[in-house]
């Protein structure tokens, strides 16, 4: 069997047999809002008790508070739910949408292309079988979260988001968990407690968006904005040469398990429509697309043959399926194309290159630009956010921050104001390849010219010498621009520039970018961002190995790396790891010095002797070393200790 067929078979088996897969030592908890149907999921990580004294026979333990973390995995990690990918996820937001009474159910789909696909019996085996009815705004109504926010309405989605962003941090009482360094926020407004009113205000002023198509009620509300947690997008999608519907659904579930806040389906191969339907019906996170890719497929890949009619039908098709945000490359103008002539890598954006080719072939501005107001009208009927694409982003560090890139950025700022006239939510896409010392300028230019609309960047990659490791070079840039104020980071996988990512590549890209986003939150001083770090550091110092694994971004890999060299069960309670071994573990020695100093200080006080030598850490180390050799060093807790701690 070929590797292609094998991959598809394995993915099909995954879909057919998928069951709930909770994280290790974690439970799904729900925080309730002001009404019973607002239940916000979080992952609660249970921790072992800390040994604080006593004897081997009668140890004294102190409990550690469980730690709650942001959870994007949906019901796929909820033991109370039965997974059935053929019937999709629960329609969480359906009741909220219906009670607003500003939408209506359609008797049939509006897109000509969708009608053709539904009538094609050869697609029956591929088609998602439980198709929902289509919903659209009633005549004269606008159904966007931006519209509601500007009317002063706090929607259930906004309350849900406020609870989600706070992550229950008010419950922590441990001083160790609550300590946090002040950050440098570069002007971001980071309140200690996020309220539903704060969410409404940020959305109303265009500084944040809530991607929430009325035809994707399965999605759990989330927010993108620089005054909130930095988010991460995962790209999936087939190509003309590889992948299948089963594999893309598998990637979706995998990406959300590892922290994907949104997912973009960038499919460019066969059966794009059917692939997207499967993804939407099973996605707990917002789904984005680049409609241009499918429009190009409809004209057999000939860019010059694209036109507004094809594009319009594609937008309606995808909006009625439930796509939450569209990447629209409307800012690439005809006069900007010559600016790229002397670039090292020219135009590297797929969407950008398509538009540039069309503009040159017709010698006029693209239909995305000339029909932008009509695009906004379509988006307003379904609450599809617009992600204004950077078709002229630099594809090499040599081209960073050039005339073409910033000319397009200014046009994106102008289009942002147009979209806001229609109460359509907007985010701005950014680079790309930018060396570290030039990253901050990108954030400053975007804030100035795009009126503080959320920024969403691909990296940026800080060097061009890392094929196979572009997730690392881009993760560096992502952490920096996230710190400066970027609201969402688009992940890069190890396969960037080399091939279509597989399931494992998706995980590596996600973990790398969750790390970058978290580092940015810490640097900004986002309230509560340090709780997880503090909990893990405390577990590390106390040799609570299982807690270290479970608090990490990737418990499976952390555990595997540890067990690779210390596989025995005794290794789980060892006071060292294979990096330093028993004689050179800094934390073990530090613990011993701390205990010795505490004991000696007490003796010194009782006997009224000088304790000057205690101020000399070397003297303390020498004395402790002698004691260590005289009494022998016990490297493991006895089994009884382990049983009690468990």
Swiss-Prot record:
Residues involved in substrate binding: 235, 264, 293, 329, 349-351, 390-393, 429, 456
Positions that bind [4Fe-4S] cluster: 577, 580, 585
Pathway membership, UniProt: Cofactor biosynthesis; thiamine diphosphate biosynthesis
Keywords: 4Fe-4S, Iron, Iron-sulfur, Lyase, Metal-binding, S-adenosyl-L-methionine, Thiamine biosynthesis, Zinc
Catalytic activity: 5-amino-1-(5-phospho-beta-D-ribosyl)imidazole + S-adenosyl-L-methionine = 4-amino-2-methyl-5-(phosphooxymethyl)pyrimidine + CO + 5'-deoxyadenosine + formate + L-methionine + 3 H(+)
InterPro entries in the cross-refs: ThiC (IPR037509), ThiC-associated_dom (IPR025747), ThiC/Bza_core_dom (IPR038521), ThiC/BzaA/B (IPR002817)
Cofactor section: [4Fe-4S] cluster
Enzyme class (EC, first level): lyase
Binding annotation for Zn(2+): 433, 497
Iron-sulfur is among the record's keywords: yes
Pfam family, one: ThiC-associated
An example Gene Ontology molecular-function term: carbon-carbon lyase activity
Entry's cofactor comment: Binds 1 [4Fe-4S] cluster per subunit. The cluster is coordinated with 3 cysteines and an exchangeable S-adenosyl-L-methionine.
EC number in record: 4.1.99.17
Gene Ontology BP terms: thiamine biosynthetic process; thiamine diphosphate biosynthetic process
Gene Ontology CC entries for this record: cytosol
NCBIfam families: PRK09284.1 (NF006763), PRK13352.1 (NF009895), thiC (TIGR00190)
Self-association and partners: Homodimer.
HAMAP family on file: ThiC
Function: Catalyzes the synthesis of the hydroxymethylpyrimidine phosphate (HMP-P) moiety of thiamine from aminoimidazole ribotide (AIR) in a radical S-adenosyl-L-methionine (SAM)-dependent reaction.
Family indicated by similarity: Belongs to the ThiC family.
Protein name: Phosphomethylpyrimidine synthase
Organism of this sequence: Vibrio campbellii (strain ATCC BAA-1116)
